[in-house]
Amino acid sequence: FGADMEEPHVWGTLTKRDSVICQDNDFEIFLDPDGDGERYMEFEINPLNAVWDLYLPKAYSKGGEADHAWDFEGIRHAVQIDGTVNCADDVDRGWTVEVAIPWTAMAEHAGCDCPPKSGDAWRVNFSRVEYEYDYHKGGYLRRDGVPCDNWVWSPQGAINMHIPEMWGYVEFSDQLPAHGEAGRPQ
């Protein structure tokens, strides 16, 4: 997975694994391989490359509780800052995230073939959380009492990422995409 976040002032505070990363600006990945709305996985990462990965047997709204001790075994992740981090004296372009999750890390909770076969579809969503901030002593301080902005790949109809039945589908294929005259997929 990869994501590019435009952000004129890249900042973060959390550095410890399995902190509640969505308390910082972050990027999030949600995976429900069999698409049943249960047994799904979540991964969050902030500009400081701190991560939070968790497994949910069922959604919070259905009485589910997250397993915070669970990890994507063998996951690789990296953050690239285009600018500086936690420096209010300049203007940044943003930050980029790359995440590689081994199929074996998801197999136990997939409920379907993992790796998937051509034609299989998984429920997936992506989220970008961004907070308003104030300048403080050459850095940044998140504004208290101001809700964060949330962007999602597949609209939820609510500010709640834990509605897996509203996530989009990713279909796997062993075929190369067809290209039109402009070189774009048709």
Predicted regions and their residues:
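Structural preference for beta-rich elements and adjacent junctions enriched in aromatics
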Residues: 1-186
